[in-house]
Amino acid sequence: MFYNVENFFDNENDSLTLDDEFLPDGARHWTNYKYKKKLNNIYKVIVAVGGWEPPEIVGLCEVENEYVLKDLVNKTPLAKYEYKIIHKESRDQRGIDVALLYLKNKFKILQTRFIPIKQWNIPMNTRDILFVKGVTSTNDTLNIFVNHW
């Protein structure tokens, strides 16, 4: 599954990014209540997509950081599935990244790489492309690219 979670920010200031819009006194008045509501709505979508079984692989875009991902997999009912996280802070000025969640017992990671976006061979201040190669529980090899343009 792939899901653009549309500005999944915590409500803490990150001095290295332009996240002021998502602070309690920012333009969106991003309170802890709004953060928790967003967190719960995202977990509900992931569960609904999986039906009776959780999705083995979940690509996400527009996540602020590893903290929100850890909250998603540890502080919601998704915790019982023990999702693992692949994420790296990107050079994006707003601080939004791509990530992959996966079930370790269903998907074995062979390779991961974050591919920078370049213009004229110069890395741009934007989200990297996340490349993940792995083997499913049915022995199929997948090459996954998670990106957001």
Question: Where on the chain are the PLM-derived regions?
Answer:
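N-terminal, active-site-proximal structural segment of metallo-dependent hydrolase catalytic domains
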Residues: 1-82, 86-96
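Active-site-proximal beta-strand elements of phosphoester/diester hydrolases
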Residues: 1-7, 27, 111-113, 141-149
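Structured beta-strand-rich core segments of catalytic domains in phosphoester-bond hydrolases
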Residues: 63-141, 149
